[in-house]
């Protein structure tokens, strides 16, 4: 569980300390107030990649520190890394940043012990799971659906899948060996001589990744146009959501439009769908601006690297011309002839022995694939039942979900494809998830999946949601709020939201805002000169009912009118009643 977070000189944060509690922790504030920057900080703390502009402008160093509570399992893992938990059974995770010239350096520590990113990655899986905006799109990938099913099946299924991977590799090797050995002896010797030459050339080229050519071309283009890209990304960021000019950014204009439509919708509810469209557009524009800014932050001129890239491209071009035409085909060709070479050098093994080996390998593969299929079928039934149980309370009472296994040729991942079929409405045929689910339905589907997997995760793990409720309202928003509250009874949740229905159920509520301060240390009372003014992020715990009522009213209608305040008060009263009922 995340107990506290301390941030100094990160992005727009000058100095911040925030304490989190058990249950549902909610962050609210105006669009663009910097709520997601906190999630970026947590991501960086636990090994995320740092961009060139991670430090606050004008600062040469910064730090992010998180204090987490530990569990018996986590303490055992720490012991394997020679790290002792603190006396109060907590762990302090710290990431320090320093800038020297144009380079940014960072160091990570656990309870004062220096650690690498691999250790942080292992720790991250035990401490937090971040559900970012846009993650619903990953659910549409059949490979991701198969992976989710296998993870839900637990250790038994994963071990059987690994056995299939091993036997499939043995099968392909046996097949290649038989084919190679069927050649005549004279051909074998001639072939060996030819393969020796080709393998030497391919080995010297050090081919490892089939995507290297495309990646190098992209890198070459990027390195050749760094200055242009920096300028364009800065301009795009300004246009999208961080304008420093008199002309407002697109996000500002959309925010104004959202405010106008919210007011209009109070008088005409038929405008709510239009309001939702504008809100969705605003969220996407802000996310696009943030990604463009991150892209620009990571750009750096490197002439030496550009020379290395161009030299490497010449080598790969020659290899592809001879063994391709693509690099992937060249690598596959190298693997193929290496296996063929290894078999041709073993002249003692007879054709009959190779045939017998292939037959045994095929039988073994079919056996393991069949066993994996049976486990997946049972797991699919459990996932169907469990996911429907989680979806029904999310305003999807008539939902149908089928995890279908479609037979395919045996491969390294088994003998079936996994496809999620879904029908959210009565009378509608089930269709693949990618063909039928709307944005709001995908958000609920993802939340239901998280609920299913939360039972498999350690209770000490913190679930972080970045606007999981985006694009929904009314009954659906209330259902999502209730589900988040339910999850928070088992695990700590940290949610960024614009939904008053979610915020009302918070066990701890924080308001995020941007403020402008005067940094003229010598004379703070000096007339505010532009160069002394800085924008910083502030976070305020909302501890009184009055403060929370005002915040919920802002989320509801964008102002503190009587109706909004009354609605906010009713939400708080209902939340208190739910909390009291859950404790009985």
UniProtKB/Swiss-Prot annotation:
InterPro entries cross-referenced by the UniProt entry: DNA_recomb/repair_RecN, P-loop_NTPase, RecF/RecN/SMC_N
Function statement: May be involved in recombinational repair of damaged DNA.
GO function term, MF aspect, one: ATP binding
One GO BP: DNA repair
Name of the protein in question: DNA repair protein RecN
Top-level taxon in the UniProt lineage: Bacteria
Binding, ATP: 29-36
Gene Ontology CC, one term: bacterial nucleoid
Keyword terms: ATP-binding, DNA damage, DNA repair, Nucleotide-binding
Pfam families attached to this UniProt entry: SMC_N
Family assignment from sequence similarity: Belongs to the RecN family.
Keyword Ribosomal protein listed: no
Organism, scientific name: Synechocystis sp. (strain ATCC 27184 / PCC 6803 / Kazusa)
Lineage: Bacteria, Bacillati, Cyanobacteriota, Cyanophyceae, Synechococcales
